[in-house]
Amino acid sequence: MHDPLSPRRLARLWLLPAALTMSAAASAHIVFEQKQAPAGSYYKGTLMVGHGCNGSATRAITVTIPEGVQGAHPQPKAGWQLEVKRASLAKPVQSHGKLMTDDVRTLRWFGGTLADAHFDEFVMLMKLPEQGGKLYFPVLQECENGTTEWTQVPADGQTMRDLKSPAAELEVLAPAGHMQGHSH
């Protein structure tokens, strides 16, 4: 008689969600693992890179930090080097009791190799704006043979699915009881 809950069948059922997740990550664009975060929070952004450029290995990832995001810090990766570039802010901001006139605008991991058939994560910590809305993080993926610019942002009437090379999107959730753009 066939046992529907045999150990072998249970193991296959247990592994199915993991296999589906890996398959989705491998075929996806560069996206944040957590696609939403509260306004004004410190957010650990994990960018998932699911493939290289047209079959070649990834050699560098550069992320542009959008205006309104403060104090971005990259997490080091074994075998990769880091480059952090700052730029002047359009409007100075207060941060930890200091007036900041510049902030981090790009994070770059380079010098490592991520095979096209593998996936990996590139992690950063940042403070999100106090207001809700969508933020777009353009990513330049440099590979052994070519580059991919994940920089497209949806126009009115478009969705991210309409884009060939979308920037990584993060939805910043407005505080409960506050309308977007309204502050006290």
Predicted regions and their residues:
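Short, solvent-exposed loop/turn segments enriched in Ser/Thr/Gly
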Residues: 40-45, 120, 134-136
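Low-complexity, intrinsically disordered segments enriched in Ser/Thr together with acidic residues
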Residues: 107-133
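Extracytoplasmic/periplasmic copper-protein system
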Residues: 39, 142-184
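N-terminal signal peptide c-region/cleavage motif recognized by signal peptidases
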Residues: 23-25
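N-terminal edge beta-strand
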Residues: 27-49
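Extracellular adhesion/glycan-binding regions together with long Ser/Thr-
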Residues: 88-116
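Bacterial N-terminal signal peptides that target proteins for export
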Residues: 2-14
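Low-complexity, serine/threonine/proline/glycine-rich extracellular segments that form mucin-like
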Residues: 42-80
